[in-house]
Amino acid sequence: MRIRVERHVQFSNCAIKKKNDLSGSLKLDNLPDTLTEFTAHQNKFSGSVDLTQLPAAMLTLILEHNRLSGSVVLTQLPDSLCKLYLSNNQFSGALDLRRLPSSMFYLFLNNNSFSGTVDLSQLPQGIKGLDLSDNELSGEVFIPDDLFDSVGADNTKIIKRHME
């Protein structure tokens, strides 16, 4: 099944309801400029996704529980993006978390195949939740006390340390 979102459609959010078993690729590069929320979780979408062309108005993107794969560029997300959920897919490659939008407060990347050393030294100040669990990630990371328990790193080689 193919779902096509035309540019002339004016709406602020789009939800592809869960457990529809929708499949195929998910093209996000031509979404309406005014789209603020896009949800496509618990389906069977596959292939890579380009997050570098999301609408400037995008606040929330939920792509959890699919079969999406490939590397993910997180350094060119819209400045407005607050919530990004990519959990339970097959994404891989290194993660660059040094230039996330300053508005970001939830980032869930758990249960994928991301690998390499992570640097959490430049997380947005308002971040409230970050889950990196169940990936092939490593590194020693220093986390402020108020965020320490909100950073998930279970089943990784990440060593969490309290920032002094």
Predicted regions located by residue number:
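Structured C-terminal portions of repeat-based eukaryotic scaffold domains
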Residues: 83, 94-133
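A structural signal for leucine-rich repeat
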Residues: 4-9, 27-32, 50-56, 73-79, ...
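LRR N-terminal entry segment and analogous cap-like coil->beta motifs
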Residues: 1-40
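Leucine-rich solenoid repeat scaffolds
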Residues: 120-164
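Conserved LRR concave beta-strand detector
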Residues: 11-14, 36-39, 59-62, 82-85, ...
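Acidic (E/D-rich), amphipathic helical modules within compact regulatory domains
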Residues: 26, 40-44, 49, 59-67, ...
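Consensus "Asn ladder" position of solenoid repeat domains
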Residues: 20, 43, 63-66, 86-89, ...
